[in-house]
Design a protein with these regions (language model features):
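Conserved Radical SAM active-site core
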Residues: 1-88, 95, 100-106, 111, ...
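Active-site beta-loop-alpha junctions enriched in small/polar residues
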Residues: 8-10, 57, 80-84, 119-123, ...
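Surface-exposed cleft-lining segments at the edges of enzyme active sites
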Residues: 84-92, 120-130, 164-171
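A C-terminal junction/extension of Radical SAM enzymes
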Residues: 174-240
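Local cysteine-cluster metal-coordination motifs and their immediate loop/turn environment
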Residues: 237, 243-265
Length: 302
């Protein structure tokens, strides 16, 4: 089983105490977002979890105690650092601070376990194609020695994104081509393996690799382990990732990113964050009368 700690929320930045407690106690409960009365229990032990993957925009809160997880589990880290400022990502540290934190993370876990996510790419009057490429080049130069690869995607124009960011300029085919070509050239210059995420077109002619973000070969090489050959079913349409289980909850991230796919309502997310109990086995709330707890299937890929 591959355990995902951060697809639904930034668990690392805002729920570090809870996350560490879950690993210390050896289990976690996850409420089904589609069927709220159904809760799944997962055992957090090395014999049940093949690899723990992290997704965050700020690893600083967990760095001093990250060894409590990495000493016991195979791991892989996705670190999102974009070109945007607080006008788009109000709760995210500056680019400079993020680069420094990634370097520290790399020193702890090794560059082979870190993927830099530069996504989603979106355009506004401020964040133009040239702005992205200039910023990406500066970041790539600084990050190249500390990462395994870089993953990018173009923004998905969900209805809530259109509502929250009316200033977004729709990406044309020409824009995407210019961005992909530019990213490919920069990646080649600094020796960075660059790949797409999801259904973002074919840009192999620019040195961009089409792949899933969470592939068994990526996790295996990073941790020097061999996984069985498995079909990667993906987590959604167009996704090429290996199936994994997320232990977070939607509408719980206070970052306030305007393009956020996971939050429907920032006010609700802030309220949920305020009411969070680090001692609960659930990230959000408690087991309620009428809830059904089932043991999750934790089949090994090894």
């Amino acid at each position: 089983m591959i355990l995902n700690t951060g697809a639904r929320t930034d668990t690392v930045q805002y729920y570090t105490e809870w996350l560490l407690r879950r690993f210390a106690e050896g289990y976690v409960l996850s409420r089904n977002p589609l069927f709220p009365n159904k809760i799944t229990r997962y055992e957090l032990t090395p014999d049940k979890v093949d690899c723990v993957i992290f997704c965050s925009k700020n690893y600083a809160p967990i760095l001093p105690r990250l060894h409590k997880i990495t000493d016991r589990f195979h791991t892989y880290f996705y670190y999102t650092i974009t070109a945007y400022g607080r006008d788009v990502e109000p709760g995210v540290p500056s680019i400079e601070d993020s680069i420094q934190t990634l370097r520290k993370l790399s020193e702890i876990v090794g560059r082979q376990r870190i993927a830099w996510r530069y996504d989603p790419i979106l355009l506004t009057e401020k964040y133009t194609v040239s702005y992205h490429l200039e910023t990406f080049a500066r970041m790539a130069k600084a990050l190249a020695p500390y990462i395994d690869r870089c993953i990018f995607s173009f923004v998905e124009m969900y209805k809530k994104v259109e509502v929250n960011m009316p200033e977004i300029i729709l990406l044309s085919k020409t824009d995407k081509k210019a961005l992909a070509q530019g990213l490919g050239l920069i990646g080649d210059k600094y020796g960075i393996y660059i790949q797409t995420c999801g259904t973002n077109g074919d840009y192999t002619r620019y040195g961009i690799h089409p792949s899933g973000c969470t592939m068994l070969d990526i996790l295996g090489r990073a941790n020097d382990i061999v996984f069985k050959t498995r079909k990667h079913k993906g987590m959604r349409q167009g996704c090429h990732c290996i199936e994994n289980r997320d232990i977070g909850a939607y509408d719980t991230c206070p970052n306030g990113c305007k393009y956020c796919y996971a939050n429907k309502n920032l006010c609700k997310a802030m309220e949920n964050f305020k009411n969070h109990d680090p001692a609960s086995p659930l990230l959000l709330g408690y087991v309620r009368p009428g809830d059904t707890i089932v043991q999750g299937v934790q089949k090994s890929f090894r």
